């Protein structure tokens, strides 16, 4: 039955977009199309990746973990359905769930570690008031089953029928605010209720609400590690969401529910998931018509009578700074009750953002995958500056800057590989904003070092490495960095000496291999920065540390091996290089061991020479399952291998890069819910596809080289700023013609298998002749 419902939903999505796609699928020749002629957003399917299902993924990490709701490019607000609180369901939604518990105004995209946000949960209901959410397939509450065939998602828009209440819900968003439209049945006891304590992966620990006038409420939701959230509290996430919400129907019969949390009660994720939590919240105290209320677990509701198909709307602005900021955000963006106008503006914002890459050729399915991938790369790092320029600093104080937009959610270990190098091409100002955000965070917090996984000013310590240094070095090498570089270098230097190979020439267990190799790479980044800034002594110091990867290599085992602090290798496992977690983070040595992007010649020499390395790579790919789900070989579901297909370009066999990059594009990405083989990871999984489908990829951020591979499309036009366009034209490109026969750059024969960033950014045309068999003479110089 579930498969049939899914098929019907997919057919419905295809039917509703086929006319738009037909208009988009014009010939590749002719003048460049304008945004007015084309709705790039019609190619976006937000259901791609929108599942946390571990069974379908074949691994505990689950699938894409994206959300299907409404948002805008890099917007603060995401108005999205939530189907679950708790577990490792960071987006708050999973497609196979059969009930919805409400529509939140903040979400995270594609993450594990239990997630966070999911604040300001709004739910329309009818009948008796229920103050507990209930459980999927279990305890009853205010949640509702929903009609799967009615579910619709587009860029900036979401719609569904809540079948238990027979209420149609629609959502749209602006950058700092959002709007919900509910179509009610005839009922004397209709209602909109807001669960102010709700939070993905936990609970808000304190809330306040006040009635401003007969259409308006405002309040705040304080979230601390004591309430779980990011890493179930281990991520040190501490933030306050302020909201300013208005109802189209006047507040007459309204109230607050409050739950008395027992003194000393642990409020982490396990408590929120427990039956005791449902019992406690179901027995909440009701206070009628209070002007203001504060407490540890609150909700607000307004009741009214509705006629048949009566529309009732709610709009809200949020802020991480103040109530006044939330009010300004709403009033600046949504001035009236015209839902369709807000939706239209959201669509227009997406059309403009997505127009930065215009592809032609390929199939409609491939275009949907491409533009949905591009869409997913434009969710984070999101804005957390209010419309008046204020942002919450890492010192807990409001700040204002005229020189940058404060941004948040930096999933560093993931996004330094593809997402940030992609943005240096299509959104370089955003990369600069991110670096300024991380630098001011280091300054305001007093820590004066860079965080590796930032969420709303939290030094979460999630994952490993020093990815902010990679982004900094990459941006500086590309000439797009407008920081105080002396300050930035000082913070980067401190970061490298706090977390690196300084003390022993390697980093001991746990995760000795992953840490040593990742730190060696960012120590190379430091050497490049130091050299560029004229710090020759530092450059030599870090260049030596960048060779630390050699200190873990065991030639007898033909493998990197983790060392203990006393210098001894950890015992060799029975599974050898395939043993997951053997000195590695979420992977094995076969996968992590290729991560020496800054010294590929040195790595090749260490591993026995070019022929042996090519043979090892060939074996790895040949043993990889064609569905690319979690596996012990080329595991595309996890980031450490994302550069590996492009290593062939460095080994004199670029045709194998062309073969495998194209094959991965075809097999690991699909236009369906299960269309991402692993977590989206805040844009990284999708950025890989965008770059590879364009025929480009950066093996070593910090170096300005982009590998040339096999484009998916016949023509790709990238807007690179200052009125420049870089075009990648793949003549005779078909599913069979995946190999480059020859190339021209701006009309001149081009024999290299890579481009420089500057070649791309000054605009021009890379013209590739494609064929069905490898040309083993092209690109080997």
Named regions from a protein language model:
Residues 14-25:
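Bacterial N-terminal signal peptides
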Residues 522:
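ATP-dependent phospho-/nucleotidyl transfer catalytic cores
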Residues 33-470, 476-517, 530-551, 557-558, ...:
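Accessory carbohydrate-recognition regions in carbohydrate-active enzymes
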């Amino acid at each position: 039955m579930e498969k049939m419902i899914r098929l019907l939903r997919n057919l419905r999505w295809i039917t509703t977009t086929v006319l738009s796609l037909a208009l988009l699928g014009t010939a590749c020749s002719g003048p460049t199309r304008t945004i007015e002629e084309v709705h790039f957003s019609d190619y976006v399917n937000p259901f791609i990746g929108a599942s946390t299902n571990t069974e379908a993924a074949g691994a505990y990490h689950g699938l894409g973990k994206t959300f299907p709701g409404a948002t805008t490019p890099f917007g603060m607000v995401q108005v999205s359905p939530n189907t679950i609180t708790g577990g490792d369901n960071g987006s708050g939604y999973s497609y196979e769930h059969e009930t919805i518990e409400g529509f939140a105004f903040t979400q995270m995209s594609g993450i594990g570690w239990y997630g966070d946000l999911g604040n300001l949960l709004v739910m329309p209901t009818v009948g008796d008031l229920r103050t507990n959410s209930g459980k999927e397939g279990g305890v009853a509450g205010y949640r509702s089953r929903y009609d799967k065939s009615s579910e619709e998602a587009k860029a900036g828009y979401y719609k569904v029928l809540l079948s238990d209440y027979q209420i149609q819900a629609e959502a749209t968003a602006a950058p700092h605010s959002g709007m919900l439209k509910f179509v009610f049945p005839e009922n004397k006891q209709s209602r909109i209720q807001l669960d102010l304590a709700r939070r993905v992966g936990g609970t808000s620990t304190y809330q306040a609400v006040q009635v401003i006038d007969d259409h308006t409420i405002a309040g705040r939701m304080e979230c601390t590690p004591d309430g779980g959230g990011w890493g179930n509290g281990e991520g040190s996430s501490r933030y306050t969401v302020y909201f300013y919400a208005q109802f189209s129907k006047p507040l007459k019969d309204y109230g607050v529910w409050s739950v008395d949390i027992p003194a000393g009660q642990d409020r982490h994720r396990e408590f929120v998931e427990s039956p005791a939590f449902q019992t406690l919240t179901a027995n909440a105290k009701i206070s009628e018509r209070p002007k203001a209320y504060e407490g540890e677990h609150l909700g607000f509701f307004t009741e009214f009578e509705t006629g048949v198909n009566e529309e009732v709307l709610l709009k809200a602005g949020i802020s991480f700074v103040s109530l006044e900021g939330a009010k300004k955000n709403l009033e600046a963006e949504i001035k009236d009750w015209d839902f369709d106008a807000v939706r239209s503006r959201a669509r227009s914002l997406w059309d403009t953002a997505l127009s930065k890459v215009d592809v032609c050729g390929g199939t409609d399915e491939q275009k949907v995958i491409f533009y949905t991938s591009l869409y997913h790369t434009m969710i984070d790092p999101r804005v957390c500056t209010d419309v008046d320029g204020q942002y919450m600093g890492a010192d807990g104080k409001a700040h204002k800057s005229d020189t940058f937009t404060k941004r948040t959610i930096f999933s560093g270990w993931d996004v330094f590989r593809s997402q940030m190098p992609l943005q240096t091409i299509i959104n370089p100002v955003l990369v600069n904003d991110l670096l300024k955000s991380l630098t001011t965070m280091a300054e305001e917090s007093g820590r004066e070092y860079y965080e590796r996984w930032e969420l709303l000013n939290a030094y979460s310590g999630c994952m490993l490495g020093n990815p902010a240094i990679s982004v900094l070095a990459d941006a500086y090498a590309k000439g797009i960095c407008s920081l105080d570089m002396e300050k930035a270098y000082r913070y980067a230097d401190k970061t490298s000496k706090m977390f690196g190979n300084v003390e022993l020439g390697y980093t001991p267990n746990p995760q000795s291999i992953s840490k040593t190799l990742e730190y060696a790479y960012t120590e190379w980044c430091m050497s490049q920065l130091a050299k560029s800034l004229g710090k020759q002594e530092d450059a030599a110091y870090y260049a030596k540390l960048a060779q630390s990867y050699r200190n873990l290599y065991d030639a007898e085992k033909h493998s990197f091996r983790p060392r203990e602090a006393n210098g001894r290798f950890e015992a060799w496992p029975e599974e050898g290089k395939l043993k997951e977690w053997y000195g590695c983070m979420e992977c094995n040595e076969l996968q992590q061991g290729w991560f020496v992007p800054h010294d590929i010649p040195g790595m090749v020499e260490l591993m026995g020479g070019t022929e042996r390395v090519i043979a090892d790579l060939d074996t790895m790919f040949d043993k990889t399952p064609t569905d690319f789900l979690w596996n012990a070989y080329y595991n595309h579901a996890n980031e450490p291998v994302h550069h590996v297909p492009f290593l062939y370009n460095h080994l004199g066999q670029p045709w194998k890069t062309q073969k495998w990059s194209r094959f991965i594009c075809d097999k690991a990405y699909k236009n369906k819910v299960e269309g991402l083989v692993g977590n989206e990871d805040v844009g990284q999984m999708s950025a890989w596809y965008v770059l590879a489908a364009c025929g480009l990829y950066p093996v070593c951020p910090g170096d300005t080289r982009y590998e040339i591979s096999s484009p998916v499309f016949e023509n790709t036009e990238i807007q690179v700023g200052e009125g420049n366009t870089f075009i990648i034209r793949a003549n005779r490109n078909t599913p069979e013609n995946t190999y480059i026969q020859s190339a021209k750059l701006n009309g001149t024969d081009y024999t290299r298998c890579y481009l420089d960033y500057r070649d791309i950014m000054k605009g021009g045309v890379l013209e590739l002749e494609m064929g069905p068999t490898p040309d083993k003479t092209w690109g080997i110089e």
